[in-house]
């Protein structure tokens, strides 16, 4: 039986060139800033996203937390989208470690509105927390992999900067957004004061993310990384794979997007689920289960056929395409899911 891994693009495996680069990596001690491969990766990442410097961190969650801690002070409030990864999937780390309260704003598609952000910025009243940061997410995971375009990002950053707020961009999948929009990634990162992006999702590196911004910001973030236990020694072994990810795997993200669209189209008309084609902008497909089908039953039916999907939100299942999912895998998934749900519908009659 086929096995099709659609739970997340974090399941990507390193490429052969990554494994060779890791084995041959020139290394030093990165806490002393003397690992030449880490330094090359940091220079490359900063140049690619149009920032002065960047920092290699073990995970995107740590990168986001380093940014929050660097931009804010205890007692501040950060404006976030209600379903953003920073707010929903990072264990309240900003509050726990940094004393930073999150102010979530609801949106239909993950795209904050500038007027909405303007209203959320606190007045300078002694009773209020100080609004200290605006966080954006591009692509937006829980809203289906939707993209912020440059105009939208600039408008949001303008509102924040006018009020003296820095802007942090959680760009875990920012290269997916750039490829989907047909843009240089710097057009999407330019308005933000800092940006985090992952190497270990669609770009297929085994470990790591990058946090980029001005030199002074990155130096302060380096201290936060050390405090959080993220200072690594001979990290060039990992950074070597990151260099391969950025030089070899960006353009091929278009294949993942095409496969996601193929999957979404194939699931149109399948009973008991609804897929919004308009939300399939990058490499994610969200299927909404229609009663009496539950997401748990959908996941189980898929697993019986070797297809692994993610029980995401209430009544919702997420499917994510990536380098290790082929067009043949998509065809199999469409056929198997369709047959399973049609049989389920007949059994319920």
Q: For each predicted feature, which ranges?
A:
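Conserved PLP-enzyme active-site core in the AAT-like
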Residues: 1-290, 296-305, 309-325, 329-349
């Amino acid at each position: 039986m086929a096995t099709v891994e659609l739970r997340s693009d974090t399941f990507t495996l390193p490429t052969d060139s990554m494994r060779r680069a890791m084995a041959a990596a020139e290394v030093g001690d990165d806490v002393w800033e003397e690992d030449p491969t880490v330094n090359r990766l940091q220079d490359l990442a900063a140049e690619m996203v149009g920032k002065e410097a960047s920092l290699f961190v073990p995970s995107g969650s740590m990168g986001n937390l380093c940014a929050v801690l660097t931009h804010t002070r205890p007692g501040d409030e950060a404006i976030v989208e209600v379903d953003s990864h920073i707010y929903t999937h990072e264990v309240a780390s900003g509050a726990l470690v940094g004393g930073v309260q999150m102010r979530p704003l609801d949106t239909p598609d993950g795209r904050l509105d500038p007027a909405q952000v303007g209203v959320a910025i606190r007045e300078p009243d002694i009773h209020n927390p100080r609004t200290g940061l605006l966080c954006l997410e591009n692509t937006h995971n829980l809203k289906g992999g939707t993209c912020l375009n440059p105009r939208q990002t600039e408008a949001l950053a303008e509102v924040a900067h006018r009020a003296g707020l820095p802007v942090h961009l959680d760009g875990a999948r920012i290269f997916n957004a750039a490829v989907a929009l047909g843009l240089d990634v710097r057009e999407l990162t330019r308005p933000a004061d800092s940006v985090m992006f992952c190497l270990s999702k669609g770009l297929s590196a085994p470990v790591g993310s990058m946090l980029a911004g001005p030199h002074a910001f990155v130096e302060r973030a380096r201290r936060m990384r050390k405090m959080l236990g993220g200072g690594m020694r001979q990290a060039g072994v990992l950074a070597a794979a990151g260099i391969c990810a950025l030089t070899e795997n960006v353009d091929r993200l278009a294949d993942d997007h095409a496969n996601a669209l193929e999957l979404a189209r194939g699931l149109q008309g399948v009973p008991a689920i609804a897929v919004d084609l308009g939300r399939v902008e990058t490499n994610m497909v969200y299927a909404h289960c229609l009663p009496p089908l539950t997401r748990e039953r959908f996941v189980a039916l898929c697993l019986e056929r070797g297809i692994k999907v993610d029980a995401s939100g209430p009544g919702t299942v997420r499917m994510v395409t990536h380098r290790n999912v082929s067009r043949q895998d998509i065809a199999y998934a469409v056929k198997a899911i369709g047959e399973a749900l049609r049989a389920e519908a007949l059994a319920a009659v």
